[in-house]
Amino acid sequence: MARITVEDCLEVVNNRFELVMMASKRARQLANGVPPLIENTNSEDKPTVMALREIAARKINSKMIDEIEKAERERAEREAMEWAAAEVVADEDMSKSDD
């Protein structure tokens, strides 16, 4: 696959700062297991390269990245609450069995 360039991405994104922010957030998502939106024909591509490819291909935008980030954050918070609730129930069960 051809190399991806900043210029390719700047045709999609207004400025370099926004591009860096989008690419870094998306690369982090990809590294954490969010599936890519384009086929990874070169399995050696790192998350940063995949993020830039998605941006250049117009498969992702900042709104989508923010929505994915929000969903991941909400999922993590929900899991933390479930773990905390399970610990409370376990503690209550332990204190009842001690009586």
UniProtKB/Swiss-Prot annotation:
Matching SMART domains: RNA_pol_Rpb6
Pfam families cross-referenced by the UniProt entry: RNA_pol_Rpb6
Catalytic activity, reaction form: RNA(n) + a ribonucleoside 5'-triphosphate = RNA(n+1) + diphosphate
UniProt cross-references to SUPFAM superfamilies, sorted A to Z: RPB6/omega subunit-like (SSF63562)
Coiled-coil region list: none
Any single biological process term in GO: DNA-templated transcription
One term under GO cellular component: DNA-directed RNA polymerase complex
GO terms, molecular function: DNA binding; DNA-directed RNA polymerase activity
Keywords attached to this entry: DNA-directed RNA polymerase, Nucleotidyltransferase, Transcription, Transferase
EC number: 2.7.7.6
Quaternary structure annotation from Swiss-Prot or TrEMBL: The RNAP catalytic core consists of 2 alpha, 1 beta, 1 beta' and 1 omega subunit. When a sigma factor is associated with the core the holoenzyme is formed, which can initiate transcription.
Function (record text): Promotes RNA polymerase assembly. Latches the N- and C-terminal regions of the beta' subunit thereby facilitating its interaction with the beta and alpha subunits.
Family: Belongs to the RNA polymerase subunit omega family.
Protein name: DNA-directed RNA polymerase subunit omega
Native organism: Xylella fastidiosa (strain Temecula1 / ATCC 700964)
Gene label: rpoZ
